[in-house]
Amino acid sequence: MSENWLFRDKDGNPFMPIGVQAHNSSTGSPFIRKALRTLELFGGNTLEAPTYWYFVEPEEGVYDFSSVKDLIDEVREAGAHLVILWFGMSKNGHPNYVPEYVKLHPEIYHVAKGHDGRAVASLSPHCMATLERDKAAFLALLQFVKDYDEKERTVIAIQIENEMGYANTDRDYSEEAEADYQKAVPEEIAGLRFPDMWGEEASDGQAAGEGNCDNAVQQKICDAGNGKPGDENENAGVVSPWKTAFGRYSHEAFSAWYTAQYIEKIAKAGKALYDIPFYTNVFIGENAHEEAGLCYNAGAGVSRMLELWKIAAPSLDLIAPDIYNTSLYDYRRICASYKRFGNPLFVPESPVSGMPNAMNLILAAGEFEAQGVASFGAEGALDENENLNPESEEIALSMHIIAKIAPLLIQYHGTGRIHAFTQEEFEPWRYLKLPLHHVVMRYTSCNSQGFGYTTDVKSKEGRKKIARRGRAILVQTGDYEFYLCGAGAMAEFIRRPDPMDEDSYGKMSSRYSSQLNFLSVDEGHFENGEFVCDFRRNGDETNFAQYVLDGQLIRIRLNPCVE
């Protein structure tokens, strides 16, 4: 339902960001123009683009927001919206975009240490000096955005940092961090449990961190944890309270808490200055062996740590997964994981090319009701003539589909009336059971017919449309009214028998006749939230199935009186 929608336009209306993200170093007009060209070809409405700490604060305490002004102006002139990506102390866990005064003074702005005591390529969130300078620069940026854009609201959200966490270590082993590791686990998270943290599932009634030991491994750790922390050498033999609380995930939970708290301090101060949606993006944990520091940034808001992050950083409006996984299995579990604990799903990064993501974007928007989607590397979608590369055409088609039906995705969010269909390998059709109707979504690549279309499906272009991999989003807006948007798909509706009807088979046979089954089928678009009919289908174009070949949006009104 729209009242639960996070993103809003300047009039306060719910808004679904659909778009692209510029490359990391895409700053300046030529690069942004190319990104906006891709956005146009994708049918999107929102550009995500970075702003760099070292650019806006070249010297300590000296700020220059001319690049931010130029960025807002170009996006506004294009009639689009903007999500600013704050590249502060972290870009994929690395300090690439910090000012030189930070890089040149590691004695002040501490670099994290690995388990061998050597520096790793990440700044430490335990360092308050780094936090205070990062926060000051972010607040200065936020003040500029508020002063320059609050009325127009071209900027609809700000991403704080980029894929936070440690690269190449599971936690910070510096002296500063070691002292924190020996402190008590914060009460807010002491009762959390993570699956398999003791090598087997804890009993349902047992929460971690309550001082109880529910298996031999935990008992051994609890017994060892009775020592008192002393100097650094003594600490080497002392078990941290984090270990007794979280077992095998103690280092990851420790890193996640301090990383999330770092962002929380920035976000909380930001909310007091300008109430605009804040989120952070995540280098997700669903990678390879799924071990922190090896397969993803330790301390990140991965699905395993999502509940901890939501507790530690309540000023963030959402925690967003960057999803580059192509497998359907992975994609579904990632989307489901990030819809927990009151966290809205938003996918700020995904591939800009390839059939897998073209299918997965439909699932994100339809099945998992994401509040926004975007593809990374906008400029890479264009050829030398600034037309779409063939590899990006299917992504663009899926973005167009989502954009056309977005008003209904917002209106019917969370109602159970939104259904996504994506054609899996070897799949000719899919069945959906609704309270009053059977729905069969057939995919034209496996159910082709040479009639019943307004397109000449025997032409080269027509054959291409028929053969494409099917995808669609179906929204039920009434007992007998549906909207369908997609490509390579055609829907059949049959009213289900009444429970007490003795002649159910006879009526089912009659209802199978499409000629009797509908009142109207209109092809159209939404304008200011209202559906506008561009073309009314009838006769051959409705008698066999209700089809969408290349991104059409149709409204289907079924006949409630068919017998």
Where are the model-predicted features located?
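The substrate-binding groove and active-site-proximal loops of carbohydrate-active enzymes
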Residues: 17-28, 50-68, 116-136, 148, ...
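Short, acidic/polar
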Residues: 25-41, 296-312, 331, 358-361
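Polysaccharide-binding and catalytic clefts of secreted carbohydrate-active enzymes
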Residues: 108-306
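Catalytic-core region of carbohydrate-active enzymes that cleave or remodel glycosidic bonds
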Residues: 265-275, 304-409
